[in-house]
Amino acid sequence: MTRFFFVVGALLAGLGVAAGAFGAHGLEGRVSPDRLETFRTAVTYQMYHALALLAVGWAAAQGGGPLVHGAGYCFVAGILVFSGSLYLLVLTDTSWLGAITPLGGAAFLVGWGLFAWGVWQGA
């Protein structure tokens, strides 16, 4: 399972770089400044949590238990729901997608709590 978090974290970080480049070079002038800022927010949170997945992989390799693994799954879910809904909101101009974005944010928060608790227990 350790490899899973390293691989998924690295892939999501790479996709975050690609999304950031797309936002900077492909969306500027095509969407409103507010929507461009929304896209940047999605990229930022994706990158932070992709890097967090690498930390989860490292902690799991050090013997992290189910709480650490749960944190990793929450980070993946958070990226898919939080960043994914914001990307789709910007690209499709479908505003109702903003209603599910907080669910991804909640997954991030739960993930950080699980990660802290799991690392504390393993110390």
Predicted segments, located by residue:
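Polytopic transmembrane helical bundles with strong interfacial aromatic enrichment
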Residues: 1-123
